[in-house]
């Protein structure tokens, strides 16, 4: 994160204003802003390997490879470091992978607060949008880096029980105020570097929702853009606003439907975008053919990396996912928890990364399926402690 950490001079100020600022919607999220914890005790139900639906050998190998590829990032993680070390030299044959998993990991079914086993499985992707490095008549929508005047408080430095939570705002005199919401930023701009210029405000909105993307330049180059920080306001789905306005039915909400509505109602696009006060700031990503980096800071693997609620599933965990594709065909495979998302909250909840470009976007945009999830957890290691919803 490139947002400035608040200095010691402001520490007492942050303590005084913490409650007020939280009420004023300075969110305390981590990459891709997280909603408040929704977990309750009893999230993890002990199961066994026989309870897991069968997967193909190729999916087993690919899911294991996606998880093991993140192990260098987990060397200092007390939960996963020993298992990662044991996995380093395991052959990737289906039999070797199965034997390793069953010998080292226990199975826990994720359960919602009402003890339901099924939840929502959605999809996301890395979009590619036309743009420019300079402002032009056609490309006039800025992609901002982190603002110079936005300060950030890592709250666990003040309150250990708020580990991973962050407060963002702007200091005016000796007062810490909420940072501008999306509508004010769109109208007035911010004191931030402009990484690129896009041709459509809807492209920018979808780039912010996906959390990363690429800008296609006129000379054929592609500029990779990655999540850097967020303005501290809560994420509110623009599709929900369209439903509330009577413009779309809930069952019809998709990226394609939202885009079609915006194309048909250009005068109302600012109103649509203002319904989501959250605003994402970006940084330049590495020029690589690998997937974009998620919250775990490892390249995502198309079809085998998922975003999760980190209050339920710690990043780096291996999951067993059973759901369907948008066309209704079965999708069962191990997946790696390597990202988070503002809309990804709850116990039985995952967002499957589909890859880069339009084909991946078509799958992601229509992915709104029921599914069940099992967490594979190292033997002998205590389960994650469900957070107190009061916090």
Q: Where are each of the predicted segments found?
A:
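Intrinsically disordered low-complexity regions specifically enriched for long asparagine
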Residues: 29-30, 80
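Sec-dependent N-terminal signal peptides
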Residues: 16-20
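Secretory/export targeting leaders with adjacent low-complexity proregions
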Residues: 43-286
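Non-membrane alpha-helical secondary structure
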Residues: 14-15, 93
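Bacterial N-terminal signal peptides that target proteins for export
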Residues: 2-14
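Short, low-complexity, disordered segments immediately C-terminal to signal peptides
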Residues: 30-40
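C-terminal soluble interaction/assembly domains
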Residues: 27-29, 45, 56-63, 73, ...
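C-terminal motif of bacterial Sec signal peptides marking the signal peptidase cleavage site
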Residues: 23-25
